[in-house]
Amino acid sequence: MANTTKTRTHLIGGFFGGLTSAVALQPLDLLKTRIQQHQSQSIWSIVKNSKGFSELWRGTLPSAIRTSLGSALYLSSLNLMRTAIAKSKTNYNDGASKSSLLPKLTTYENLISGALARGAVGYMTMPVTVIKVRYESTLYSYTSLSQAVKHIYQSERIPGFFRGFGPTLVRDAPYSGIYVLLYEKAKEVVPKLLPRKFIKFDKHGSYLTSTSTLVNSTSAILSACLATTITAPFDTIKTRMQLEPKRYTNVWFTFKSIIKNEGILKLFSGLSMRLTRKALSAGIAWGIYEELIKLNKF
């Protein structure tokens, strides 16, 4: 019963962390998709040509579904995997730091567990990702999610819902592996860099909620920035393949086509939007997740 409750706690923490970040940051995701779609439009021109302020939240429902469920599945799967690895050691320790209750692993173990968990969950949520990207773009005039599902199925059948999984996997698996690795390292370094007045302890020697939230969110933001920059080209390739599947048929062709026709810097188009969104999303989601885990410890 304890294991079930613990897993449920991670599911709930991941769900609400992902849901909050998805709704709050949807405009950044939409702008990133449209910047990658168009070769010359600026952020300002896209905003100016939008059909009102609410247009910036177009695609929020599929985004919220994908992010909340994906985050819940990912974080609970990641925890199960990391806990199993940690328990297999003779010197098992279920608390990584004063700011966290997550297991402490080696650099290599954090990298591998993060990548494997993300790859598996990414495949399960791929259909929602495809619907979200097309719903956000201006290439498709979908008026409802059901219309998007029907159109994709009629024109591309089941494979259409998994369009772009290759570059998505190549982007998300390394991203998550690198992120988890950096995040765990950052939680050790950030407290040493913060002014002493921000570091406060409770009677048990753990950080107060305000301190742990600051440490965890700051660590998440810094880690997300670096991991996002490294994997940015695959995000552009993924988006092109999902928006124009008949033109961009595979990862290698898409990569060569973008470099030949638009230049290597185009592979990093939308990076500012993705960087901002991923950093803020990580800060919000992991900050909420870590604290909910502590509140619901059994």
From Swiss-Prot:
GO molecular function term, any single one: glycine transmembrane transporter activity
Solcar repeat coordinates: 5-84, 105-189, 211-295
Spans traversing the lipid bilayer: 11-36, 59-85, 111-136, 164-187, 215-241, 270-288
Coiled coil: none
Ion transport recorded as keyword: no
Keyword rRNA-binding: no
InterPro entries assigned: Hem25/SLC25A38, Mit_carrier, Mitochondrial_sb/sol_carrier, Mt_carrier_dom_sf
Signal peptide residue numbers: none
Cellular location(s): Mitochondrion inner membrane
GO terms of biological process kind: glycine import into mitochondrion
Pfam families: Mito_carr
GO cellular component: mitochondrial inner membrane
Bilayer topology annotation: Multi-pass membrane protein
Chief location: mitochondrion
Top-level taxon of the source organism: Eukaryota
Chemical reaction(s) catalysed: glycine(in) = glycine(out)
Keywords attached to this entry: Membrane, Mitochondrion, Mitochondrion inner membrane, Repeat, Transmembrane, Transmembrane helix, Transport
HAMAP family xrefs: SLC25A38
Function recorded in the entry: Mitochondrial glycine transporter that imports glycine into the mitochondrial matrix. Plays an important role in providing glycine for the first enzymatic step in heme biosynthesis, the condensation of glycine with succinyl-CoA to produce 5-aminolevulinate (ALA) in the mitochondrial matrix.
Similarity comment text for this entry: Belongs to the mitochondrial carrier (TC 2.A.29) family. SLC25A38 subfamily.
Protein's name in the database: Mitochondrial glycine transporter
